[in-house]
Curated annotation (Swiss-Prot):
Binds 2 [4Fe-4S] clusters. One cluster is coordinated with 3 cysteines and an exchangeable S-adenosyl-L-methionine. Residues 373-433 form the TRAM domain. Its main location: cytoplasm. Catalyzes the methylthiolation of N6-(dimethylallyl)adenosine (i(6)A), leading to the formation of 2-methylthio-N6-(dimethylallyl)adenosine (ms(2)i(6)A) at position 37 in tRNAs that read codons beginning with uridine. Its cofactor is [4Fe-4S] cluster. GO terms for molecular function: 4 iron, 4 sulfur cluster binding; metal ion binding; N6-isopentenyladenosine methylthiotransferase activity. Monomer. HAMAP family: tRNA_metthiotr_MiaB. It is found in: Cytoplasm. Keywords: 4Fe-4S, Cytoplasm, Iron, Iron-sulfur, Metal-binding, S-adenosyl-L-methionine, Transferase, tRNA processing. This is tRNA-2-methylthio-N(6)-dimethylallyladenosine synthase. It catalyses: N(6)-dimethylallyladenosine(37) in tRNA + (sulfur carrier)-SH + AH2 + 2 S-adenosyl-L-methionine = 2-methylsulfanyl-N(6)-dimethylallyladenosine(37) in tRNA + (sulfur carrier)-H + 5'-deoxyadenosine + L-methionine + A + S-adenosyl-L-homocysteine + 2 H(+). It comes from Campylobacter jejuni subsp. jejuni serotype O:6 (strain 81116 / NCTC 11828). Belongs to the methylthiotransferase family. MiaB subfamily.
Length: 433
């Protein structure tokens, strides 16, 4: 019997990418589906959604409306992920042609969903047996691995605890075996995923070997054949000295750190319920630069959070100047349902929010130009992962710069030393040496 065709579109973060991989594995290995990039020939159309900001939620309904117009007769449409978790039955009301709704903590029920009319799975609790999935990887050379699920922080602007539930650490033996299996299949790099990875080990579903995130990094680095370990996202509150020292000194841990700032104002951080101050954040970031001079630090920043004054915004700009981030992900505050910030007084007007965002992004662009210029004539070890147009190939350095050289498919999955000859804001161009 010929395979049925599966089309899947993934929106949002790396955790969504991994969730999509899990669903692909279940469907291709257990239900006789094969992936297609042509939505018109698909028997099953999935969209894996994001709800961190309002825009992706609006995009969901425009996308599924488009799917309904082009799908072939008899094809099913499933809405999965975080927006599915928090909207639930409203999706059926607004898009009655959707066949099932599957929340972020219910992806293991995908085979049940495709067989049940108007199936809706939006629970945010987990049974530990659901940590074990069939396996599929979008990349041979890099493997995403969940180490925790959910979040206990309840930051006042964030909907994630309402869509992914409370934080649970995945048992070490499951993580280790998954990493080992990925390396046996050709992975050179593993990418550990969680809302707050460096809070690992604080809460397991049942009794398991006790270890913290630093211990986990050290244990995983013993896997023979594994060359690189990346992770996202750590929480600044849990960046103790042990963690920073393991990060700096373990040669397999990539020297790229995502440190979500959100705001440089201690008052706004308190209103956000982030748990740290501007002073704590700067202490940790500058300590990291001291321990690991070649580290690349990225961050998330929200401007125009309710009550943010010009002085508060200047505090954020001050952190930008002091830390000099290699990369920022910056956004205007987006009011999310179910969050405390949505009903806070002193919501900021759109004009002020746009001005602050432009000021932040423009200054960071200037800083980034200075940073990348200093990379010219340096030599980096690059893992090549992606073919580019014009007989080119791209990969990343240990500290996460994107590097492009002339090269062909035979370089995929290989490490090469590359000398940078022309540094641009988004890409470093170079030559293999």
């Amino acid at each position: 019997m010929s395979a049925k065709k599966l089309f899947i579109q993934t929106l949002g973060c790396a955790m969504n990418v991994r969730d999509s991989e899990h669903m692909i594995a279940e469907l291709t290995q257990k239900e006789n589906y094969a992936l297609t990039e042509d939505i018109k020939e698909a028997d099953l159309i999935l969209i894996n959604t994001c709800s961190v900001r309002e825009k992706p939620v609006h995009k969901l309904f425009s996308e599924v409306g488009g799917f309904e117009k082009v799908k072939k007769e008899g094809a099913k449409i499933g809405v999965c992920g975080c927006t599915a978790s928090h909207l639930g039955n409203e999706i059926f009301k607004r898009a009655p042609y959707v066949d099932f709704v599957l929340g972020a903590r219910n992806i293991s029920k995908i085979t049940q969903a495709i067989k049940t009319p108007k199936f809706m799975g939006v629970d945010i609790d987990y049974d530990e047996s659901e940590f074990a999935f069939a396996d599929f990887r979008n990349s041979i050379y890099k493997s995403y691995i969940n180490i925790s699920i959910g979040c206990d922080k309840h930051c006042t602007y964030c909907i994630v605890p309402h869509t992914r539930g409370d934080e649970i650490s995945i048992p070490f033996n499951i993580i280790y075996k998954e990493a080992q299996k990925a390396v046996e299949k050709g992975a050179k790099e593993i990418f550990l995923l969680g809302q707050n990875v460096n809070n690992y080990g604080k809460r397991f579903r049942n009794e398991h070997k006790k270890m913290d995130f630093s211990d986990l990094l050290e244990e995983l680095s013993t896997i023979e054949g594994l060359e690189r370990i990346r992770f996202t996202s750590p929480h600044p509150l849990h960046m103790d000295d042990k963690f920073l020292e393991v990060f700096a000194n373990n040669p397999k841990v990539c020297k790229s750190m995502h440190m979500p700032l959100q705001s440089g104002s201690s008052e706004i951080l308190k209103a956000m319920k982030r748990g740290y101050t501007k002073e704590w954040y700067l202490n940790r970031a500058l300590k990291l630069r001291e321990l690991c001079p070649n580290v690349s630090i990225s961050t998330d920043i929200i401007v125009a959070f309710p009550g943010e004054s010009e002085k508060d915004f200047e505090e954020t700009m001050d952190v930008l100047e002091k830390v000099r981030f290699e990369q920022i992900f910056s956004f205007k505050y987006s009011k999310r349902p179910l969050t405390k910030a949505a009903t806070m007084p002193n919501q900021i007007d759109e004009e002020t929010a746009s001005r602050r965002l432009s000021t932040l992004q423009n200054r960071h662009s200037e800083i980034l130009d200075e940073i990348v210029k200093k990379q010219e004539n340096k030599t980096f070890k690059v893992l090549f992962e992606e073919l580019r147009a014009g007989n080119s190939i791209a990969g990343r350095t240990d500290n996460n710069f994107l590097v492009q050289v002339e090269g062909s498919e035979e370089l995929l999955g290989q490490f090469k030393e590359v000398k940078i000859t022309n540094a641009k804001r988004m890409v470093l161009y170079g030559e293999i040496v």
